[in-house]
Amino acid sequence: MTFKRALAFMLLAVTVLASFAACKTEEKPVEETTLDISGYTIVKPDITSNDITETISNFKKYLLSYTGAELKVSSDWYNPTQTLDESGYEILVGNTNRTVSADAAKELEATEDENSFIIKVTDNKIVILGKNDDTTRRALKYFLVNYAKTVEENSKTVNLKKGHSEIKTVTSDSIIFNNFTEFETILRSTVTAPESKWAIGTYEYPTMIQLRHNGKHNGTLLSTLESGDAGYRIMKSTDDGVTWKQIASVKDYLNNGYVTTWMPFLYELPVDIGDYKEGTIILAATSRNKSSDFDISTITLYVSTNQGRSWKTICNVDKAGGLSWGVWEPFLIYEESTERLYCFYSDDSDPKHDQKLVYKYTTDLKTWSELKECVACDDPALRPGMISIAKMSNGEYAMAFEMVGISGAPIYIKKTKNLDDWGPVSDYGQPVKTAEGITFGSAPWCNWTPAGGECGTLIVVGKHPVPYANTEEGAKMLISFDYGKTYVAIDNPIPYAIYSDSRCGYSPHLSFSEDGSILYYMNNPEYGVKYSCEYIELVKIKITGMDD
């Protein structure tokens, strides 16, 4: 009995030890935190908007860029005489006919906020769905940024696991485009306004610069505008546009008896030119004599070497006649390759043309080149005018101008890679309009920033819709992500009304922060009562693209 008991005890001990050893060496299964999407297909509803179709195309492109997974896109159409096969691995975008899309839509419907979207993962589906096209677009961007951009390159995975489900609500004051570039309004402020809302007169034609070549003063904002014959007000902001104060009033002390009236333009020298150092502030504007018939106008330059506090009148770029044959609307731009400062402007003085676009250049701010044409139409009755020029990363300059003489004074863009060669002067480029025909006319401004899409962002603004619509709303803002080949329209960030004799929206202005991520947009909406006066408002818009 003793031997049998001992043997039994030994066998029990061995069993217990073996069991203990098995417990010590057994490993728990590793929880999957990524999902292989290499075998998935992107599926969209068979009937959907062109905007969502374009957005899905960009979604596919970014998925490939971030994960290395090259997925096909197909619609959810199927032969209704056959049973719908839902066994495939799919990324479902929008309200598809798949069962899991319907289930996700029910969950989303339970939320009261219209700015919501859902992302849900089942065994073989990923659902990305918003309550409308805008929120679906935001859901796709959210998916890319949070789950695709965060994985290893060429992993062909996303940072999601089966069973994941989340509902998000969008709260920011922003616009999102089909390429996922986003415009978010971050500030509205008044630059300057008449003392009374019942005043008679106009505050218009604002321009602005952010100092970049003035050492400790860099980042300061300076602005000017038209506000009568008392001189050009110089407004300053040291808190990036939140508050403003007037620091100077610029008058013409070169042309005896002339008044500073119209079309001021601010510019900061990016390099030394002649006797003037990098960081010198230049104001170019149109002066006129005080004679009763107003028979002389000039393009005159003023300089400040102390960040806009005091000014000196230094030269006339050109001089011509009065209202019917004068010189107007100067625009300055420096070209590194030629080391020239160019002054573009509108010229009424040629009897062969009602108006044409011309320029001169200087290398010392004392002497100027002979006058050269960039747009002079074959039809002498046409009046191209109000130049602004933006340099883009493809090496092209885009020049926007109005074409008075065509109904509504539509806006055109003409391009060149050389400021001294605009091709045939009778060629006035292409009209600025969307594929749907949305466009505008009069008082244009254009500018370009590297922020946004792969080609950066070209923005063009103007005064009124073309043709004049049955509305009192001002012009849209047009955006291009392909160097001005195509445009999309958004509501004007500074809403204003258009009346028969209103000056609202006359010559809006676009400029950017040094890194291009902040758009400073200025315009003159109505201040007070209809037909009374306008004030200058600033809107700051943060621009972010997928790779910003």
Where are these regions (language model features)?
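Asp-box/BNR beta-propeller blade signature and adjacent active/binding-site loops
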Residues: F177-D548
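Bacterial N-terminal signal peptides
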Residues: M10-A18
